[in-house]
Design a protein with these regions (language model features):
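Nucleotide-sugar donor-binding patch of glycosyltransferase catalytic domains
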Residues: 188-189, 281, 351-363, 389-431, ...
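Conserved beta-strand positions in the Rossmann-like core of class I SAM-dependent methyltransferases
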Residues: 67, 339, 399
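Short beta->alpha connector loops at strand-helix junctions that form conserved
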Residues: 90-95, 173-174, 382-383, 400-404, ...
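Donor nucleotide-activated moiety binding/catalytic core segment of transferases
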Residues: 305-306, 314, 339, 343-345, ...
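Conserved donor-nucleotide binding/catalytic region of nucleotide-linked donor-dependent transferases
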Residues: 417, 421-422, 427, 435-454, ...
């Protein structure tokens, strides 16, 4: 009897030990489980915005398990990151009759800004509808146990997705400070330069008036133009309840949803702008990797007379043959090596033009790594957000050839404000003018000195951007959902500075007095 009791006791001990060991293993597995991040790239246009989101996905895959939402036939996403084995891809099927991806095509033929805005709205709504009408994608995302969703701020509908999935979200603002929309405070508007505001002093009254006008325009464009369409799509695809969708204040939801905002800016001049704690500057992020492939490294190392990098982004394929011949002629007269990114025109170039021996053509180039090389002396650029940031970061003078949209603002910022180059009107180009401006920049030390100073200021301002990204993500993962839900946006009249408000308030009075004066003069004449 005692032996039987002893056997039972031993069996009980064994079972208890097994249960404890199993519990310990499960606890260990939970503790060691890597947080899962869902990244929604910006697929509306092939641009710096989409490129940065893809680069961010690759960077984060070294620290987290990252899944990327992507359209099945999206060439841009597929080309750049689909072969990365550290990333998981959640594909959704296109609803279009063709296999062409939904993508904006911004032309250089005088396309009006309103047409661009209309395209962003329509394409954004179309992609949102396609993504989350796919029941398989929505099921995969909901069951994926994701700790965080990261999205681009121009994906206006993602706030609805975050609320539906009930997970923390971070928005990435890749258009610089000018795209910061903070409905809780106008502090940003009072000190941060917006689009076109390089024409005024940084902290002057005129600057604040311009910035406030842009803020109000952006505010009402979102409220009256973008957000109603987003709410309609969200209701149609089941993210919002049909009965309550019309009563949703999407402006408030869009403001409350992001736990944090990562701001990628290329402007060292706004370094001291006051930012709320949830806004984190990451200018210069992901630019520290400057490793070159052997092909490029060999060319750069042997070019002791210096290298000129030429890249026009998406504008590379928009120049006519006359303009291209003028460029080739000017580049061929230089003693420097020219590395030219020409996009998909490689075969056309070789068959159509005689390429000088000092000019090397590539369909794409590792621009950031090339600018970091000590032999690089100049960047000829369209002045996009990515190119100008890389030029500032590495202290390389520029010859700016702005083509569209914010590129003219970027060009003025670098040439007028920072003094690190010159601007050239590519539409009135002559080979002699191009050659002379390149030679002038290369022979004037002031441009290089100013570029180095801008680089120093920029790096001191946005220190440790990669660390800032990781810390922000860590905090967001550990934060409760709807952390900002107790805050309500105030009306802009409550936030606007007193002097600007006085000026705005006096305008109707001034107009009224002018009308009275005009009527009085007319009556006297009668």
């Amino acid at each position: 009897m005692a032996k039987m009791a002893t056997s039972r006791f031993k069996l009980l001990l064994c079972l208890t030990a097994a249960i404890l060991e199993s519990a310990t293993m499960c606890t260990s597995d939970v503790e060691n489980q890597q947080p899962r991040i869902l990244l929604q790239p910006f697929e509306v246009m092939q641009s710096f915005h989409s490129h940065f989101m893809n680069s961010l996905a690759v960077f984060l895959s070294s620290y987290y398990e990252v899944s990327v939402i992507s359209e099945e036939n999206h060439r841009f996403t597929t080309r750049h990151i689909s072969d990365n084995k550290d990333l998981n891809f959640i594909k959704y099927q296109t609803l279009r009759k063709t296999n062409q991806p939904v993508m904006m095509d911004i032309k250089d033929d005088g396309q009006l800004p309103m047409k661009v805005i209309q395209d962003i709205k329509s394409k954004g709504e179309e992609i949102m509808r396609m993504r989350y009408s796919d029941a398989g994608l929505l099921k995969t995302v909901r069951e994926g146990n994701y700790s965080l969703l990261i999205y681009n701020s121009m994906d206006y509908g993602t706030a609805a997705v975050c609320q539906f999935l009930d997970i923390p979200c971070i928005q990435v603002i890749t258009s610089g400070m000018g795209s910061v929309h903070n409905p809780y405070s106008l502090e940003l508007v009072n000190s941060v330069p917006y689009m076109l505001s390089e024409y005024t002093d940084l902290n002057s009254l005129s600057k604040r008036i311009v910035n406030t006008l842009f803020y109000l325009s952006d505010h009402y464009m979102r409220t009256l133009y973008f957000y109603p369409g987003v709410v309609s799509v969200a209701r149609d695809i089941g993210l919002f309840d049909h009965n309550t969708a019309d009563s949703i204040d999407y402006l408030t939801m869009a403001a409350e949803t992001p736990v944090s905002s990562l701001i990628y800016t290329n402007n060292a001049a706004d370094c001291h702008a006051t930012l709320p704690s949830s806004y984190v500057r990451i200018g210069g992020a992901l630019l520290s990797n400057t490793t070159l492939e052997r092909q490029f490294q060999t060319i750069m190392d042997r070019s002791i007379d210096g290298v000129i990098v030429v890249a026009f982004g998406r504008g590379a394929g928009t120049f006519n043959q006359h303009t291209l011949r003028l460029m080739i002629k000017a580049f061929g007269k230089l003693n420097h090596t020219v590395l030219w990114s020409i996009g998909s025109q490689m075969e056309v170039f070789k068959d159509t033009y005689t390429i000088p021996p000092n000019v090397y053509l590539f369909d794409s180039i590792p621009q950031n790594a090339l600018l970091a090389h000590p032999n690089t002396q100049l960047l000829v650029t369209h002045s996009g957000q990515g190119s100008t940031t890389e030029a500032i970061y590495h202290g390389v003078p520029i010859l700016a050839t702005p083509l569209r949209m914010d590129q003219k603002t970027n060009a003025k910022k670098l040439t007028k404000l920072l003094g690190m180059g010159l601007t050239l009107d590519i539409r009135a180009l002559t080979a002699q003018e191009l050659y002379k401006k390149i030679q002038h920049i290369l022979s004037t030390n002031e441009y290089k000195t100013n570029a180095i100073m801008a680089s120093h200021t920029f790096r001191q301002c946005d220190r440790y951007p990669e660390r800032n990204i990781l810390n922000t993500i860590k905090d967001a993962i550990n934060s409760p959902v709807n952390i900002n839900s107790d805050r309500k946006p105030k009306h802009w009249v409550q936030l606007i500075s007193v002097d600007v408000l006085i000026i705005f308030s006096s305008l109707p009075v001034v107009v009224f007095l002018c009308l009275v004066k005009c009527c009085t003069i007319r009556q006297k004449k009668v």
